[in-house]
């Protein structure tokens, strides 16, 4: 059983209890933790849409600690991140592997971070199917289609050529945050919260 801490907030109307994750959503912080699957993805998509409706001009902060998971679930989160108006700042804490690394890279350019001792991994999608030869061929072609789509997403967000992405994705590629920064998965390795604030000021100054 997972233990989720409860926090008590004092308001003018008295005390109110929140689970810790719901309280952090009030601060526009979303957690992507554990395997990426349909139920978790639905909650994250709902949180993104809610925070956009609350304030479409204020950043959302996504903290990622995930080994990856179901591609379609991950892509539903990815598409929503691109769809909504607020910038989504991503931060890797622990690990961002497979679909987790794609979500990390999909944050707003200039606002993608990793803590210094995190681990990041990219690879091509995998899957298995049993049945008639024709059915196996259909599913194999679908995996190849998904592989091409994921490669194109990494190409878009890292600035690398498609050929380079295909080479890196051929096998499991583990990297530390500094290597992830060099290949464009993140923008900066940070150790303290103040580093994010400094970076955001710099980005705003460049835009202005």
From Swiss-Prot:
Classification via InterPro entries: ClpP, ClpP/crotonase-like_dom_sf, ClpP/TepA, ClpP_His_AS, ClpP_Ser_AS
GO MF annotation terms: ATP-dependent peptidase activity; ATPase binding; serine-type endopeptidase activity
Enzyme Commission number, as recorded: 3.4.21.92
PROSITE patterns for this protein: CLP_PROTEASE_HIS (PS00382), CLP_PROTEASE_SER (PS00381)
GO cellular component, one term: endopeptidase Clp complex
Gene3D superfamilies with a match to the protein in the record: 2-enoyl-CoA Hydratase, Chain A, domain 1
Keyword Lipoprotein: no
GO biological process: protein quality control for misfolded or incompletely synthesized proteins
Catalytic site positions: 98, 123
SUPFAM superfamilies, sorted: ClpP/crotonase
Catalytic activity entry: Hydrolysis of proteins to small peptides in the presence of ATP and magnesium. alpha-casein is the usual test substrate. In the absence of ATP, only oligopeptides shorter than five residues are hydrolyzed (such as succinyl-Leu-Tyr-|-NHMec, and Leu-Tyr-Leu-|-Tyr-Trp, in which cleavage of the -Tyr-|-Leu- and -Tyr-|-Trp bonds also occurs)
Subcellular location: Cytoplasm
Keywords recorded for this protein, A-Z: Cytoplasm, Hydrolase, Protease, Serine protease
Function: Cleaves peptides in various proteins in a process that requires ATP hydrolysis. Has a chymotrypsin-like activity. Plays a major role in the degradation of misfolded proteins.
Family: Belongs to the peptidase S14 family.
Subunit (UniProt): Fourteen ClpP subunits assemble into 2 heptameric rings which stack back to back to give a disk-like structure with a central cavity, resembling the structure of eukaryotic proteasomes.
Protein name stated in the entry: ATP-dependent Clp protease proteolytic subunit
Source organism (scientific name): Wolbachia sp. subsp. Brugia malayi (strain TRS)
Gene encoding the protein: clpP
């Amino acid at each position: 059983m997972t233990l989720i801490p409860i926090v008590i907030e004092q308001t003018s109307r008295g005390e109110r209890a929140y689970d810790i994750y719901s309280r952090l959503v009030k601060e526009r912080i979303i957690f992507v933790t554990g395997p990426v699957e349909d139920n978790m993805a639905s909650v994250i998509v709902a949180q993104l849409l809610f925070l956009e409706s609350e304030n479409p001009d204020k950043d959302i902060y996504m903290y990622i600690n995930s080994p990856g998971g179901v591609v379609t679930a991950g892509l539903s989160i990815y598409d929503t991140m691109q769809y909504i108006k607020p910038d989504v700042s991503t931060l890797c804490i622990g690990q961002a592997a497979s679909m987790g690394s794609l979500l990390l890279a999909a944050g707003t350019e200039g606002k993608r971070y990793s803590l210094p001792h995190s681990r990041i991994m990219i690879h091509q999608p995998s899957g298995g199917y049993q049945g008639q030869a024709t059915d196996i061929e259909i599913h194999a072609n679908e995996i190849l289609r998904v592989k091409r789509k994921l490669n194109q997403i990494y190409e878009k967000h890292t600035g690398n050529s498609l050929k380079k992405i295909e080479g890196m994705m051929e096998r499991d590629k583990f990297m530390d945050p500094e290597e992830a920064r060099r290949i464009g998965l993140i923008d900066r390795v940070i150790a303290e919260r103040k580093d994010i604030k400094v970076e955001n000021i710099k980005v705003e100054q460049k835009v202005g």
